[in-house]
Structure formats: C-alpha cells, structure tokens
Amino acid sequence: MPEGHTLHRLARLHQRRYGRAPVRVGSPQGRFTEGAALVDGHVLRNAEAYGKHLFHHYSHPAGGGRVVHIHLGLYGTFSEFSTEDIPDPVGQVRMRMIGAEYGTDLRGPTRCEVIDEAEVGDVVARLGPDPLRADADPARAWQRITKSRKAIGALLMDQSVLAGVGNVYRSELLFRHRIDPFRPG
C-alpha cells in the first residue's frame, strides 16, 4: 500500500500538471461515471494529500466546490501520459483525467468518490496528524501514543494516531531507533 509520502508526491504532481485549469474527467471502466460527470470540465483548484488520502478540489459554478476523494489501498495506481499521444484505456481504468499537456489513469483504488468540502473535514477528523503537512500537530500523536498500552508498532500503523505511516516507515523508524515493535506506547 502506498504510504503518505507517495500521496504527497502525487498531489504535487497533479497540482503542477492539472491545477488551476479545466480538466476532462471520465471513467472508461464505468464505475465512476456519475462522479466523473460532476467534475468533468471544471477547474482543478487544488490537489492535496492527508495521510494516505488524496483530494482533488474542483471549482463549481454553483459554489461550494466538489472534491474527488481517492484512497489507493493495496492495489491503486496512477499512470501518466502525454496528451500528444493519448493511449487507449488499458485494464480497469476507474478515472481518467486529461489536462492541457498531460493525462493520468487511475486503476484499482479502494476509494474514488465525489464528496463535498464538509465531507473532506469528516475524513480528516478521523485521522491523526500527517507529519508531512505543515499544519501537523505532533503533540496530538505523541499524546495518543504515550497514553496507550498498545504495541508501538501497531500504534504507528493506526491512521487515527498518525496519518500516512505504513509498514515500511514503521519498520525503518523502529529499527533505526532500536525500539521493539511490541513495546507498549
């Protein structure tokens, strides 16, 4: 499963390639057709990551904006291409987004849905601080960890404690600091 840093990289890439301009959004597979229609032709205002969640914020003429919420899960991937040579969709492309110069295909996500800004807040409220965000509050994570008797390895994987950490970072962090993953928080 991609860890938080991968989603932050994707958010920066999508912001750079598609941000502040109208994009075409479709669903060759058909499972996201209704959601794609809600944002197709709209301006991608901002792409941001929070933990393992990716949010594409779109402007909307009626106001309020719409957001495509993506969680890649175990199998989700994005593949990029140039609009000079747009390939036919291969495999189960849930969402295809095409900008002026680049396009991207999303395959196999756990979640790909259109939500509103309030629902973004609901998703984020269930998560712990994301250490890669400037607005992260590390004291919040520290408080949850130190008050728990759960194993530190399990706490680091708990997205409500610390958002974005996966098995690779958990293992490396504990190994480098010589902390037993079964030690209580």
Feature locations, PLM:
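Structured catalytic/nucleic-acid-binding cores of DNA maintenance enzymes
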Residues: 1-185
